Amino acid sequence: MSPRTALRPALRTGTAEPWVDDPFGRAVRAGRGPLWLRRADGSRLALEVERWCAPAAGADHGLVLRCLGLSAPVLDLGCGPGRLVAALLAAGVPALGVDVCAASVEHTARLGGLALRRSVFDRLPAEGRWGGVLLADGNLGIGGDPGALLARAGALLAPGGLLLVETAAQEVDEVADVRVEGPDGAGPPFRWARCGPAATLRRARAVGLERAERWDSHGRSFLALTRS
């Protein structure tokens, strides 16, 4: 198995794929939850579907602000329903989303944006030439290996580009097998990670990324990283 295949955000059960053939796509189409990530131990983490499907607000504006004036377009990895892509375009910043969920890609298009239905580990346009790359809304967890994901995201950046990462607000460092769960059932299991600011920065430095900025806004925590 190649590293790329191993890091896909899926442990397949039958033909179902997480974020694709599970309650997430149905929630995006409905524009609302409730929706959770259910851990194997029974605990669960709420997913903010309503916020993701609404226009950019609150801490989102800090991400958009930091993309103004970048020398090249912005790539939103795991763009979900596309609110950040739409907000960037409205601010005059060229942007493209990437997501494995067809409902997310369709929702992004309805907002006037463009998204590709691909894994972040698939081949993507303009690799090494993006002015900014976003990992927001918990997407640092994709694949269950934050170090590998940060290395992948950093490799997409142009020289001088900026990687904007939303971390967990608290200092946590965990990897767990989870399922997306809604009122009508749960999807297949897959590996997911959560890292707070310190754990994220340790992994970033290990793959050649350096901290440019750290900030908190509206209860959310962020890092801006550059290639060293």
Please report, for each region that a protein language model flagged, where it lies by residue.
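A short SAM/SAH-binding and catalytic strip from SAM-dependent methyltransferases
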Residues: 130-146
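Short alpha-helix
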Residues: 190-208
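Conserved SAM/SAH-binding beta-strand->alpha-helix loop
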Residues: 101
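A short glycine-rich, Lys/Arg-flanked "PGG" loop and its adjoining helix->strand segment in the class I
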Residues: 147-159
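S-adenosyl-L-methionine
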Residues: 2-66
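Conserved beta-strand signature within the Rossmann-like core of class I S-adenosyl-L-methionine
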Residues: 160-168
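Conserved class I S-adenosyl-L-methionine
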Residues: 71-80
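Conserved SAM-binding strand-loop segment of SAM-dependent methyltransferases
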Residues: 112-122
